[in-house]
Each structure stands twice: as structure tokens, then as C-alpha cells.
Amino acid sequence: MALPSNFLLGVCCFAWLCFLSSLSSQASTEESQSGASENVESEADPWSLLLPVDGTDRSGLLPPLFKVLSDRRGETPKLQPDSRALYYMKKLYKTYATKEGVPKPSRSHLYNTVRLFSPCAQQEQAPSNQVTGPLPMVDLLFNLDRVTAMEHLLKSVLLYTLNNSASSSSTVTCMCDLVVKEAMSSGRAPPRAPYSFTLKKHRWIEIDVTSLLQPLVTSSERSIHLSVNFTCTKDQVPEDGVFSMPLSVPPSLILYLNDTSTQAYHSWQSLQSTWRPLQHPGQAGVAARPVKEEAIEVERSPRRRRGQKAIRSEAKGPLLTASFNLSEYFKQFLFPQNECELHDFRLSFSQLKWDNWIVAPHRYNPRYCKGDCPRAVRHRYGSPVHTMVQNIIYEKLDPSVPRPSCVPGKYSPLSVLTIEPDGSIAYKEYEDMIATRCTCR
């Protein structure tokens, strides 16, 4: 009886070992498959590295620009804007921002968002519906779904693009009749405004329609229906001189908006810190110019330290006295070799597979802070007193308390020109996108 019992025990042990080995192989296979899928997903969606495991941003920790683009998942916009409209917005971008995407401090406008919409529908009416002139009116329908509730209209412009054949040295007086379809039932006469310009010097015609569209945009109207008649008279010639403007494409609608959300950059809040005179009262011959405080603190501080070091070395000469060595010893506590400072990190939006959306800038340098924080940090880094207290606690009382970390202390905004999913073009200024100063906290 002992032999069969031992045999049964051996069979059970062998079966149990086989079961455990199959479980371990299955777990390793699933782990490798999940790791491979995670690698594929991270390659396909670079922003997935910024999200939790389930891919949702519950805490709202994503930077505003990254959050906007992460919702699009790298898809190509379904509609592409007209090339002339895109060219106009690129020129606008160069006027407002530098090549690196930083908003120019010389600008004085209050809007931080500009949206260009192309008409989603265009229909030419019959001649019986004309308001004035020999040309029929053109119906234009603009879809404003991309305008958010936090974006307030400051100015609206109807943009016409002129053909190259329209160049002329003659003075042309243009009359434009605009009718908002929703307002025709009230029986009011269509607004009319004269514009005088020389075609040779203009590629675009901008017609201010703020007074017409302000009530509609304020009331969150998502669809604007306009009827437009655009005729011009050359050299003030009477009726036989009236001709049609050679327009290459239907007009676009441009909205200049003030985005009041927290993710947008509000330039009027930093005007005092951006501009300041360099001369004191009573001084003459010194011109006032814009001064960027962040640039001064970031760029001049290292140079000043290097200059002071050179002066001290020249004064001391080749003699290495004990006092000089002692000063060098104490200086390593105040200015460590691997001190906390800004570092560049230049990347291209094509590396993140966001170049389908972002037209400008092509490259982005967010910069980052790296290095050791010295013991005396308040004067140089603008750190609070708490940082010094934390340093003392770490050194004297409890080493488990972390030392102050080298982190960004100030940021600058980033101007971005993007193509929206509906084919519209948007210029936006995002807050806190480029580190400009480091601090220890």
C-alpha cells in the first residue's frame, strides 16, 4: 500500500508543477504583449506619456496646448484652409510673434486669439435680389462652432483677397453692401460703407463688420448668414465705369477675440513688468527701451559672476594664499559648479507628430531647470525664506526632509498658429509655455 500512495503523491506534485509553469509562461506572454502594445501606443501617441494609465486627464495637469492637441490624436484636419487665407495668417503671426513663438512685447492690442473662418456655403442669388450695382449679391454662411464661451469679440473683419490682375495705378473707390440675413425681417436698410485705396498697393481688402456681428457673437450665435455685394468705381467714372472686383476666392471672416480662460496669455497684466524706462528723473541722453526682466535675470547673472571671478583672479595674480583658497572653499557653497540654471531643449513639432495641426512655430524650446541649489539662495534665485529654513532642517535636524529643488520660477507665453478640425485657422497665445528663470523651492 505504501507504493501506490507514493506514486499518487508524485503524480499530484508533477501536475501541480506543470500547472504553475503554465501560469508563469502565460503571465510572461501577457506582460510582453502588454509591454509591446504600450510601446506601440507611446510611439503612435507621444502625449499618452503625459496621461494616466487609462488615458484620461482627470486632474487637469496637462499644459493647455498639449491638452488641446491630445484631444485630436494626431489626425489630419478633415478640411484644409485656402492657401491665400493661410498666407495672410502667417503674415499676421510674424507681426505678433518672434520666430521662436514668443509674443512680441511691442504689440499693444488686447486680443490673444485670432480666428479666420472660410465660408462653409456660398450661393449666388438671382439678379432680382440685388441691392445696388450691376452685380448679384453673394450669400455667405460662416460656422462659428470653434468660438468658445470664454472668447469675447473685440473686432471682426471681412477679408477679401485680390487677384494679381487687379493691380492698377488708378484710385479705386469701393462700395460694399452687407446684409445680415437674420436682420432682414426687421426691414432695416443694409449698412453701406465706402473704402478708398489703390489696388497696386493692396493684396487684401479688410472691411470692419464689428458693429454688424457683435450682437450675434455675443449671443453665442453659431451660424452667421451674410449677403455681400462688392462693387468699385475706377477714377470716379460714372455708371459705365462700374466693374466687378476680380476676387480670387470668397471673403473670409476674421474674429479678433479676448480669451479670458486661464490657459490664455493676458498681456495687459504684464505690461508694467515688460516695459520700464532705463533713465532716472533728471538724466538726459539715455533713451527708454523695452526691457525684459526675465532676460536680465537669466542672461546677465552668469556673466556678472564670470566677470567678477576674472577681476578677482587678476587682482590676486598667481599667488595662491591661504585666504584665497579659503574663499574658494566657501564659494563652492554659494555657487556650486553644477548650479541651478536654465538649459535648452529644442524640439520639432514633427517629432511629436503635431505638425499636421501646428503651422507655426516649427520648433519649440520649452527650456528646463537643472542643477544644485546653493545654501544661500534667497538673493540670487528669489527664493522664499522657507527654502533656507528647509535647507537648515535637512542639514541639521532631519535628512529625510528633501533639499530644495531647482525648478522654473518664471515663464513666458507661446504664440501658436494652428489649423482647426473644421478647416479654420486660429492664432492663440498660451500662458506658461517657456521657462525663463530658475529658482530653488
UniProtKB/Swiss-Prot annotation:
The keyword DNA repair does not apply. GO terms for biological process: negative regulation of cell growth; oocyte growth; positive regulation of cell population proliferation; regulation of progesterone secretion. Phosphorylated; phosphorylation is critical for GDF9 function. InterPro entries: Cystine-knot_cytokine, Growth_differentiation_fac-9_C, TGF-b_C, TGF-beta-rel, TGFb_CS. Ovary. Strongly expressed in germinal vesicle (GV) stage oocytes, MII-stage oocytes and in zygotes. SUPFAM superfamilies: Cystine-knot cytokines. It is found in: Secreted. One of its GO terms (cellular component) is extracellular space. Keywords: Cleavage on pair of basic residues, Cytokine, Disulfide bond, Glycoprotein, Growth factor, Phosphoprotein, Secreted, Signal. CDD domains: TGF_beta_GDF9 (cd19403). Disulfide bonds join 340-406, 369-438, 373-440. Residues 30-306 form a propeptide. Ovarian physiology and fertility are controlled by endocrine and paracrine signals. These act in a species-dependent manner and determine the ovulation quota in different mammalian species. While humans, and mammals such as the cow or red deer, normally ovulate only one egg per cycle, other mammals such as mouse and pig can ovulate in excess of ten per cycle. The mechanisms that regulate the species-specific differences in the number of follicles that go onto ovulate during each reproductive cycle are poorly understood. Required for ovarian folliculogenesis. Homodimer or heterodimer (Potential). But, in contrast to other members of this family, cannot be disulfide-linked. Belongs to the TGF-beta family. This is Growth/differentiation factor 9. It comes from Mus musculus.
